[in-house]
Amino acid sequence: MRVLAVATPALGHLFPAVPLLWALRARGDEVLVVTGGDALRVAEAGLPVVDALPGETLTTLFGAYQETDPAFFVALRRSPMTTLRDLAPVLAYLAGRLLEPARRAAERWRPDAILATHGQAAGAVVAAEHGIPLVEHGFGFVRSDGAQEAVRQLLAERLGPAGSEPPPERYFLDIAVPSMTSAIEGMSLRAVPYNGGAVLPLSGASVGGRPPRPRVLVTAGTQLLHTHGAGALAWLPEVAAGHEAEFLLAAGGADLRDLGRLPPHVRVLDWTPLATVLPTCSAVVHHGGSGTTLAALAAGVPQLVSPALADNHINARAVADRGAGLETAVPDATTLTALLREPAFAKAAREVADELRSLPAPADVAARLHTAFGLPTTQGDA
């Protein structure tokens, strides 16, 4: 089977789908990814990728869209999104930019199925045009609320009726934790964290168990520090200075000069796979990104979430409502201490980790997709 993955050019949208794409490859299926910007890093996962948007990043794409619809982001800041449908206008813009490259890739490569990241309608249009199944892959706790249909309708205003036609078959893979959401959409899939790879020193923070002293991981994800600067972490020097914990700051190579001199027990890490560091930590403080949220849940680590953008507040609320962490506008020492000292948070986080391990693994879902498509289910027979 050949699977063409059409992905919104954002790590947070594409990286959650990497384990399923690996599972398909391990079965002997062929995979080709069409995306752009930072999401081209998926090539580091051993997956072939087509650069559909040469020279573009998510920041430049958002900037270009803002020029055409300046009121959209203003309205979004005033009234945060509640479902993915709220992002339909910008998702339609991104789909429009990806559509022709995705069409060309499909014409040349002739896939048997399309995998699209959540709300990425370019994949849906191509699946409909070729009469092949669409698999839409979720990336967190945000619910669809008809986002795919809304985005296709906006595309149809430019493409004509063909743009609104649905694929012949559609499957949705939901990586949200069942106990932390109102209802699972489609097929449940275990969230297996993928944050890239790294060469790790045996003596470093990423190998081994938790140290005797509490260790707190601090991260602002893949976008926030680069788009908003170190000001997103302005709280850190003061909180760390008066706290007993050791702090690991996963900065991803961002410019931190505006933070000034950091206390000696704050260690700055470059790009670091969170899944390798989190098991050594007693807590994580972050912005509410889906990838970080799910990685912490998989590791059973309590979270202090200060939501920043887009769906961040949805993830923060899911964590807080489950008792696996706390939500705060600005992290402070008192709240962090409460998170570390109250055992109920760690207990709830471990319960969620156990729940995640009970969900269908990517290999299981890959086999189910073969069955759904009427293809052989024995590994290697596809």
Curated annotation (Swiss-Prot):
Organism this protein belongs to: Streptomyces olivaceus
Effect noted on mutating residue 312 to T/Q: Increased transfer of L-olivose and decreased affinity for other deoxysugars
The protein's name in its UniProt record: Elloramycin glycosyltransferase ElmGT
Pathway(s) annotated for this protein in UniProt: Antibiotic biosynthesis
Annotated disulfide bonds: none
Catalyses which reaction(s): 8-demethyltetracenomycin C + dTDP-beta-L-rhamnose = 8-demethyl-8-alpha-L-rhamnosyl-tetracenomycin C + dTDP + H(+)
Effect noted on mutating residue 312 to S: Increased transfer of L-olivose
EC numbers, comma separated: 2.4.1.331
Function field: Glycosyltransferase that transfers an L-rhamnose moiety from dTDP-L-rhamnose to the elloramycin aglycone 8-demethyl-tetracenomycin C (8DMTC) in elloramycin biosynthesis, an antitumor polyketide. Possesses donor substrate flexibility: able to transfer at least 11 different sugars to 8DMTC, such as NDP-D-glucose, as well as NDP-L-digitoxose, including both L- and D-isomeric forms of some sugars.
Molecular-function annotations in GO: hexosyltransferase activity; UDP-glycosyltransferase activity
GO biological process, one term: antibiotic biosynthetic process
Pfam families with a match to the protein in the record: EryCIII-like_C, EryCIII-like_N
Entry similarity comment: Belongs to the glycosyltransferase 28 family.
Outcome of swapping residue 309 to I: Increased transfer of L-rhamnose
Keywords attached to this entry: Antibiotic biosynthesis, Glycosyltransferase, Transferase
